[in-house]
Amino acid sequence: MLKLKEGFNGERTIVLSKIIVDLLDKDPLASMLHITDIGYYPKAEHHYIERKEAINQYVFIYCMDGCGWYCINGNRYEVQANQYFILPAGIPHTYAADVNNPWTIYWIHFKGELAPLYAQNALHPMSINPEAHSRIGYRINLFEEIFHTLKNGYKTENLQYVSSLFHHYLGSLRYIQQFREANNDSINDNNAIETAIHYMKENVERRLTLKEI
């Protein structure tokens, strides 16, 4: 079976150099939580990663469409659309796209003193169900802002801003109920058209059926 680490049509990735990562490890703000690698893989057919040697970063994967799976500590987990998981640092693992319905994923490698807090309870697949107040589009925009800020260069202000954004990004998942309730007045649940439009925006990565809408 063909196994690919990268090279997918439409992929986007940024890998920070060791020099930059070492600077982040020592930065008063960024050392608390910072990104080392970030990317987006659409329809990642044959995607397969096996790490027999543990790495010192946490691995965040957010499946927007399709399916996949991962193995860690002898356990295998299936991942569906609108689910994410975080693999802890220091433990060998394997993950891959489904053969018949490969996933579309946003992924981030990260580390820092607060990394264990944000990764807590996310070893199992965590669902982010699209609904009136799910704010999935907002979170995607946060990812894009992080990505483009890094793409604009690695000066200290950029790196510290990315660290601040990433706190917000992971916080929107770790404290998902609070994240949703903070903006629960913006959508009128009784307006069917408004709700349908919002649902389509929250599922921009997927091909929705009329029944789902």
Identify what each model region corresponds to:
Residues 34, 59-62, 138-145, 165, ...:
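Amphipathic, well-ordered alpha-helical segments in soluble domains
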Residues 115, 136-139:
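Mobile beta-alpha loop/short-helix "lid" or hinge segments that flank ligand
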Residues 30-125:
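N-terminal regulatory/effector-sensing and dimerization cores
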Residues 125-137, 150-164, 170-212:
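Short, Lys/Arg-enriched, Trp-marked, Pro/Gly-tolerant hinge/linker segments that flank
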Residues 117, 145-150:
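Juxtamembrane segments at transmembrane-helix boundaries
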